[in-house]
A protein has these predicted regions:
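Small-residue-rich packing faces within the transmembrane alpha-helices of Major Facilitator Superfamily
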Residues: 100, 124-128, 211, 265-269, ...
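Hydrophobic transmembrane alpha-helices of multi-pass small-molecule transport proteins
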Residues: 130, 153, 183, 199-219, ...
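Specific transmembrane alpha-helical segments of multi-pass solute transporters/efflux pumps
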Residues: 98, 102-103, 131-177, 181, ...
């Protein structure tokens, strides 16, 4: 989406897979981009493993930190914290605040950008920037098949998912949209069941609880906007879950940053082409929408993905996945403070129910994988 989108999505009984960071905790970017299982070295999944469900052990991943993921070109005055705890705190602040604020940035950008064009252009140029950044690290270059697979996955995760989110947010408030995006893991459970994985009763309870929360959010809360907008956002969540499921079965580039850059840029390119063919045009450009667009591209897509990559590699699953619960709350608060959105009792109730259902879904997924 414009998200994202966090931890392992409950999609299959396949061996642990790599995840490349991005749009996913739930933000307007939603969840990180998953890597193909074929690319992941085999590891033992023990309860003490300091990795996300579905993520290879930090030792098995490319040494992203050693390849200077945070080094900035030139003599940029910003200095990163010297300690590990300081860098983790900084990465958490970036992921929490940036991905939680991208919903407001999308809202402001839509004053000048058509929805699909916004999704396409921001991700196209963000992906190109990440690709240039990755190229400076002398990465392992992908094969043609890996590029093709990255394009297919990126089209679902970025083109369709982010485009539908932006389309829905024309009529749905930012906080409501963020809470609805948090349902991605629930849709991932349904897709996994359709694909043949045995789903525990508790996981179905989580899905049902999430649907109750969605119903409360849309039928009890006047801020939920139009039905068409809400359906568009939910479709975006389905596309993201489907793209993540597909990514777990395709061979993607082994280098994390290269894979992320390709998925973002190629998905953005597809969205831009579709937007142009469908007649979307930028008629006029306001100063505020343009600044919001730059924020989405440079901070929401590029900086936040690098920060999430650091969390995946250097923290526990609980810490790394905490953005799944913090981002919707941040989005609701920012919408109320800066956009005048009303926080009703229905918003609070629906948010608590949906986040509880997501937590239940993750708990059963961790349990199934032997991580709890």
């Amino acid at each position: 989406m414009s998200t994202p989108l966090p931890p392992r999505l409950p999609d299959s009984d396949s061996p642990p897979q790599q995840f490349v960071p991005p749009q996913s905790q739930p933000s307007a970017d939603v969840l990180p981009f998953p890597q193909a299982a074929a690319d992941a070295p085999s590891v033992s999944a023990s309860p003490s493993a300091d990795v996300l469900p579905g993520v290879t052990s930090p030792q098995a991943l490319p040494d992203t930190a050693a390849r200077r993921p945070f080094n900035l070109p030139g003599h940029f005055p910003f200095r990163l914290p010297a300690t590990h705890s300081g860098r983790v705190a900084l990465a958490l602040c970036v992921v929490y605040l940036v991905w939680g604020s991208t919903y407001m940035a999308v809202h402001l950008s839509l004053e000048s950008f058509p929805p699909l064009m916004l999704s396409g252009l921001r991700n196209l140029f963000a992906g190109i920037g990440l690709f240039i950044f990755a190229a400076r690290r002398d990465p392992v270059w992908p094969t043609f098949a890996e590029v093709r697979n990255a394009a297919a996955v990126g089209t679902l995760l970025v083109g369709l998912s982010s485009g539908m989110l932006a389309f829905g947010m024309r009529t749905v408030e930012t906080g409501t949209a963020a809470v609805m995006v948090a349902t991605v893991p629930l849709f991932a459970t349904v897709i996994a069941a359709i694909a043949g994985r045995k789903v525990a009763k508790g996981e179905w309870i989580a899905v049902g609880l999430g649907l109750v929360g969605i119903a409360l959010l849309n039928h009890g809360d006047p801020s939920s906007g139009s039905t068409a907008g809400s359906l568009a956002i939910l479709c975006g969540a389905v596309f993201w879950a489907g793209g993540s499921f597909l990514a777990g079965r395709l061979k993607l580039p082994s280098d994390l940053l290269v894979s992320t850059a390709l998925q973002i840029s190629l998905g953005g390119a597809m969205a831009t082409i579709v937007a142009w063919v469908s007649g979307e045009r930028i008629v006029s450009m306001g100063f505020t929408p343009f600044l919001a667009y730059l924020y989405l591209m440079l901070v929401g897509s590029m900086a936040a993905y690098v920060a999430y990559a650091y969390l995946i590699r250097h923290t526990s699953p609980i810490i790394a996945s905490s953005c799944m619960y913090v981002n919707p709350v941040v989005a609701v608060v920012i919408g109320a403070l800066f956009l005048g959105e009303v926080i009703t009792k229905w918003t609070v109730m629906a948010t608590l129910i949906i986040l509880a259902s997501v937590g239940l879904s993750f708990w059963f997924d961790y349990k199934r994988r032997g991580l709890v």
